[in-house]
Amino acid sequence: MDPPAVGEAVKRVIVALDPARRGDVDRLLDMARLVCGVGAGIKVGLPMLALGGSEALAEAARLCKGGGLRVLDLKLADIGYIMRLAAESLSRGFDAAIAHAFVGYEGGLVELKKTLDGLGARLVLVVSMSHPGSREVLDPCLDKLLAVARRVEPWGVVAPATRPEVVARVRETLPTTVILSPGVGAQGGKPGDAICLGGADYEIVGRMVAGSPDPVSALRGVAEYIAARCPEKLLHSSTGNGPS
């Protein structure tokens, strides 16, 4: 049995399953079945759609049903009508879908939010990204993007594990909104940076787990690292925001 802090930490790790080639699709779908019963859930997006089609997205959602959060990451960024069509076609079976906050409210995110509400899914808005280029455009506009998020009232927002100071700023502005933080591992963020230093609810880990020959052990290793950094914080806080 995991120590209490590790048991809490593993429930804060979402595994990103992004195939690099067509041959990876089946392997990552098999992995979905394994990690969904251990971690917080999975995130799939454009690589899975491009290489496996909408059927692969639906299969990932099916395999993880009842095993954690199922996050669809298409980073939607269009007028409301187009985002609504995409959500109606691809979001069924997922607990949450990601879109860009910069689209704005009127004629955009308000329509997507209404569509997702009708599908029983939650909206997650990107307010900052994990790559260095986010500093060029998104981060200078962070206050405006957070204002959009306050107006839209999404379930969650995306903020980068690679810059925990941004996560902390988002947490200060949106104290009750779920924060999902990508960029752990290959992009340079250390496990626990976003949760322990920034106040994120979830960290998203991709290649560090998905590229391992033993993904469950790799996932537990990430959780152990997080737990060692801030056990008290983990034990005295709970996301309470899993799928209903």
From Swiss-Prot:
Top EC group: lyase
Name a GO CC annotation attached to this entry: cytosol
Task: Spell out the protein name for this chain.
Answer: Orotidine 5'-phosphate decarboxylase
Give the top-rank taxon of the lineage listed in the UniProt record for this protein.
Answer: Archaea
Could you tell me the gene encoding this protein? pyrF
Q: What protein family is recorded?
A: Belongs to the OMP decarboxylase family. Type 1 subfamily.
Q: Name one GO biological process term.
A: 'de novo' pyrimidine nucleobase biosynthetic process
State which Enzyme Commission number(s) the record gives: 4.1.1.23
Assembly and binders = Homodimer.
Q: List, from the UniProt record, the residues annotated as the active site of this protein.
A: 75
* Gene Ontology molecular function: any one: orotidine-5'-phosphate decarboxylase activity
**CDD domains recorded:** OMP_decarboxylase_like (cd04725)
